[in-house]
Design a protein with these regions (language model features):
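Short, surface-exposed secondary-structure edge patches
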Residues: 215-221, 255-259, 349-351
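Sec/Tat signal peptide C-region and signal peptidase I cleavage site
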Residues: 19-25
């Protein structure tokens, strides 16, 4: 089905009869609907995202502004149609493809320590977003949403304050700013891996109910997709593929339309830059000390998002949304997860199975004083992370360390936050250095 993430995306049908619309001119970008910001999970799990919930509207508006900017500058491989323009979408959309941003993490960590007799408050904000391109089709009277391309975005920021702790308003500003920065710095580069192209065929046989279309090859096509019938280079109707052969397809035609042999048809293909699809499917915490500091159900989704983000930076890697966290249903042919829209409605999205499932294991953490004198203590921190990719027969343990010099009786720190920050750095190292 979608194992190679090569999905021919077929244009939406105009109701027949209607005025013919011009075929897309050479060089003109295809249209994709931008459907806004979703939340990973369902109505029961919304409460796990307190920072997002109190910033839902502000975050949505800020990300929308950024998406409009890159769209207006022509930096994307397609033209975005925004949700406020849905009437225009119905008339102009060339395919069933949509783009959405999904919030998957909104973590805030804080620690206080003393430096030269002054209390310092450190705040860490971790924003996790996954961008998804998905195809929507009507199957048995219901919309079926299938993710065909995705990539993570991570906003990770630290802030140091004096004796006064960071307020909720300041945290909110840091949260939104980090999300916008992550989007601005990555969206164009990562969407550049997507190409939309046209494929053409010719009607060889036709009746009042169906037409047989010679497409040369049907590799990658699927039943249920749409094709446009063209006359004099203009769209005049759209039909649905109901049967596929090796080189041809049988297309159901709309009532009142009579295709003729020799008539041209057109479809729009979406292709990702790689057939190598990865997905973090598991994060374990096998270290007892690490488990006391970082419960698996909390650190797992965070580490999965970080690793996925850094792995995406490696050329040619298509990284599916992490299966760690959220609401997932798994089957032999793929997985499905639930998202919540801005109105609180739940939507089900399907995902093809990855070619390379990835497992992570936090195997150890360590912190100890390595040097000491009358004035200072030198503390060493170390974290170990194992990466396993069974389909590649690959397994390797990575480690990272850091040190902190503290003035005795004056400076202090919180061990957990030092190790948390080091784990973030280690996921980057592991993703970038893994021999895959």
């Amino acid at each position: 089905m979608l194992l190679r993430l090569i999905l021919p995306l077929i244009t939406l049908a105009f109701l027949w009869p209607c005025l013919p619309a011009p075929a897309r001119a050479d060089g003109e970008r295809a249209h994709v609907a931008y459907t806004g910001v979703y939340l990973m999970g369902n109505a029961r799990t919304k409460g796990n995202f307190p920072v997002y919930l109190r910033n839902q509207r502000a975050l949505r508006d800020a990300l929308r502004v950024e998406m409009k900017r890159v769209d207006e500058q022509g930096l994307l491989p397609f033209k975005l149609i925004f949700d406020t323009d849905m009437e225009e979408v119905k008339l102009r959309l060339d395919n069933t493809l949509s783009l959405a941003l999904v919030v998957v993490r909104d973590d805030v960590g804080a620690e206080s320590f003393n430096a030269a007799g002054t209390q310092i408050n450190k705040t860490i904000v971790n924003v996790g977003i996954t961008a998804i391109l998905y195809d929507t089709r009507m199957i048995n009277g219901q919309d079926r949403n299938t993710v065909v391309f995705s990539f993570p975005l991570v906003g990770y920021a630290q802030r140091l304050d004096g004796e006064k702790k960071c307020s909720d308003a300041e945290i909110d500003s840091l949260f939104i700013g980090s999300a916008v920065t992550a989007l601005r710095e990555n969206i164009v580069q990562r969407l550049a891996r997507v190409t939309l192209s046209d494929i053409f065929g010719t009607v060889t046989q036709a009746s009042a109910a169906a037409a047989t279309v010679d497409l040369g090859a049907t590799s990658g096509l699927e039943e249920g997709q749409r094709v446009y019938f063209l006359a004099a280079g203009k769209k005049v109707a759209a039909g649905t593929i109901v049967k596929l052969g090796k080189k041809s397809a049988v297309v159901e035609v709309p009532n009142g339309f009579a295709p003729r042999p020799g008539m041209k048809v057109r479809a729009t293909n979406m292709r990702a830059s790689s057939e190598e699809t990865f997905q973090v499917v598991e994060v374990r915490v096998s270290s007892r000390k690490a488990a006391k500091l970082f419960p698996q159900e909390v650190i797992g989704p965070q580490a999965a998002q970080w690793f996925s983000n850094f792995l995406t930076d490696r050329g040619g890697k298509v990284v599916l949304p992490s299966r760690v966290g959220g609401e997932w249903d798994q089957s032999a042919t793929g997985t499905a997860f639930t998202l919540v829209d801005r109105g609180g409605l739940e939507h089900r999205f399907e995902l093809p199975p990855p070619r390379y499932p990835v497992s992570l294991d936090l195997t150890g953490v360590s912190s100890k004083v390595t040097e000491s004198n009358d004035v200072n203590d030198v503390c060493m921190f170390k974290v170990w992370l194992k990466v396993s990719i069974p389909a590649m027969k690959y397994e390797k343990e990575f480690n990272a360390f850091s040190s902190k010099t503290l003035v005795k009786g004056v400076q202090s720190f919180e061990e957990k936050n030092e190790l948390f920050d080091l784990l973030y750095q280690l996921t980057a190292k592991a993703a970038r250095e893994a021999e895959i």
